[in-house]
């Protein structure tokens, strides 16, 4: 073929069947329809998508060309004389006719034979397939099948034993599962404040009951002698006089009573003790005069005993003075034991702080509080001493 179909594609008229010809001779493909004026480089399924629009290369790259009869493409140079099969399938050792006897170095290199042992035994641990022999320039990466795979998929268990996490110090899981009723861990500020306020409410309740009990005692001490005969009138007045210092002394000793709730609150919510006492008073009015007289006499004796104990306590306090607080505490305990169970409970309740008390008294220990100056007990002259003005402006001479 001396004439090309398209001169623009083959300007040198190199037509022919050579590998450098612009239009190699081949049979028409089944999908090809020859039209008048259509170029030979019509798009074919093996060529790229731009064959119609681009002129082919002047010297096309050499491909695997079939020879005079079909042969599979040749492998790379390093696999020419290896035992790898060409077309896949199971590996078969090459025919003995094509093998030359291997020297010891080749046997050691190919089959991993130990150089000190040249026998046919189990020490020939190399596989028949020398696939581990790589082309030059390649590196064997021991211990992994592929480049990116770190763990063999066939290995069902890890080589290293699992770490026991229970022996390690784990961080606190603040946002994990909690009990259904808990909004936060038990040691948070909210929980502590709830406890504090609950204690304060309980203390306020106890204090209210205690104040109501004191008021009822004072009321009972003033009313019950009035119901008695006219001969007992001066005695009832004396009991009222003794009850008044007793209440004053209680207020002096326990400042929490000064913050008791208003009487309107007490009247709104009377304690069960008050209700019981009112029922007792109704029963007393209904009972016989003789029984009433006996009860009144017994009550008067108890009140007299309490007032005498309180008078003795007041005298001892006046003699002791302000400096002996420990003795006062002991005397108070003795008096409370003698007064009975109600008075003992009352003293125990007095130990708690009410809501209105300043919390500054809780700051610091007793020893620390003693070191601070209490300005309530100092006069104006002690706080600001009268010093002559000449002494104020004197600068001490420190040169000598």
From Swiss-Prot:
Highest taxon of source:
Eukaryota
Composition bias type Basic and acidic residues, residue spans:
1-11, 46-57
Q: Which residues form a coiled coil?
A: 299-335
Locate the region Disordered: 1-68, 134-164, 203-353
The reply on keyword Hydrolase is no
Basic residues bias located where? 31-45, 137-157
User: What is the predominant subcellular site recorded for this chain?
Assistant: nucleus
Write one Pfam family the protein is assigned to: CCER1
Residue stretches of biased makeup (Acidic residues):
275-347
Q: Name one GO cellular component term.
A: nucleus
| Residue ranges, compositional bias (Low complexity) | 209-220
Keywords from the UniProt entry: Coiled coil, Differentiation, Nucleus, Spermatogenesis
Among the GO biological process terms of this entry, one is: spermatogenesis
Instruction: Give residue spans, biased composition: Polar residues.
Output: 255-271
Q: Which InterPro entries match?
A: CCER1 (IPR027889), Coiled-coil_domain (IPR052696)
Signal peptide location in the record? none
UniProt-annotated location(s): Nucleus
Function in brief: Regulator of histone epigenetic modifications and chromatin compaction into the sperm head, required for histone-to-protamine (HTP) transition. HTP is a key event in which somatic histones are first replaced by testis-specific histone variants, then transition proteins (TNPs) are incorporated into the spermatid nucleus, and finally protamines (PRMs) replace the TNPs to promote chromatin condensation.
| Protein name per UniProt | Coiled-coil domain-containing glutamate-rich protein 1
Record the organism: Rattus norvegicus
The taxonomy runs: Eukaryota, Metazoa, Chordata, Craniata, Vertebrata
What gene is this protein translated from? Ccer1
